[in-house]
């Protein structure tokens, strides 16, 4: 098991796992961060107050907190009463990769992907980071016609192409 060494450089709660088997390590909004309203479509970089020494051969990958808006310590205040079981948070994490050779303070990139403003509050869980092994593969440029040695079942299909595979040979009226 690797150890992720960290240092606090601001007044912030130490990163922690929700449970012993949680993949993600929870990060908090620093206590000295001003309460901030984030408008729909806007983004924000929050200094985490944490520097990390990422072990050799690893990276940190940022991820959204699935329970952020449903927890009692909600990170966002939407001003709306949540529906039973609804996930209210429109906050997503951007700029997710932290390379092993980065030595500065981590910043958390928040994006309001919703259609209403949210309020970011100090002291609450905002994101999680996962320690992920990295394969530093070699890069080799080859001519496009030499790139693949066999044709796969998927081929050059794009996003969602496996869902429409059976529709390709149907007329439009047959698909409706």
Task: Please provide the spans of the model-predicted regions.
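DUTPase catalytic domain/fold
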Residues: 1-176
